Amino acid sequence: TGPHDVAFNSAGEMVAVIGLGANPLSRTASVELENLGQLISATTSGAWSNWVDIAQYEADENPAGGPLDSNPFSVAAVDDGYIVSDAGMNALLHVSASGTISVVATFPTRTAEFPPGSGSMVPMDPVPTGVKVGPDGAYYVGELTGFPFPAGGANVWRIVPGQPPELYASGFTNVIDVAFDEDGNLYVLEIATNSLLSGDPTGALIRVTSSGRHQV
């Protein structure tokens, strides 16, 4: 896996998140795997180095509980460091300018109907993906959702540090990124608008305004 996302701080310094999508302890299988699950720093000359081991934090702390799994997915610069979403950890992390990790939020596991129409419910991970700082200074995080990837089952959460995640918008499918325009409208990017299980690769970009949602 390569970089999932990049961010620049006010000094123009770049960081990138490198995914993993596995138990962090599996990285001992080879030297090359040690570079996965990292927040890396890069210079203007193109040189890079591992900076913060996000996956190791999951191995050490497992903030959301459950089986060990780390997949650093998105990063956003903030005044005192960076905000990182980890899709495997089901958590949003703060990384200070000195590289110290702390938990901003964890996301709740839910249930979803599977097979569709059966009435049977199965556990579903939230799988937080894209994160952005909103115009109000809060953090906004989209969900891919885990299996069975139900159509309309993904949320966008609003997070203020020190408070539980607040549901901001719902009814999306397999979200991989979020963004705001200069007017404060939220854009939500779906990788598979009819569900990853549908076999249809069509995605969608959706603009959410005060008057509703509109596909772009």
Language model features with spans:
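Short loop/turn segments that connect beta-strands within beta-propeller blades
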Residues: 42-46, 95-100, 159-164, 208-212
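Short, conserved, GDST-rich strand-edge loop motifs in beta-rich repeat architectures
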Residues: 16-37, 140-153, 188-203
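Beta-rich, blade/repeat-based domains predominating
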Residues: 1-14, 18, 58-82, 111-139, ...
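Beta-propeller fold detector
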Residues: 1, 48-56, 102-109, 113-114, ...
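Generic structural signal for coil-to-beta-strand starts
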Residues: 13-15, 38, 80-83, 89-90, ...
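C-terminal closing repeat unit and adjoining cap/tail of repeat-based domains
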Residues: 194, 202-216
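A gly/proline- and charged-residue-enriched helix-loop-helix capping module
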Residues: 9-12, 17-64
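A short loop-to-beta-strand structural motif that recurs across blades of beta-propeller domains
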Residues: 35-40, 91-94, 103, 154-157, ...
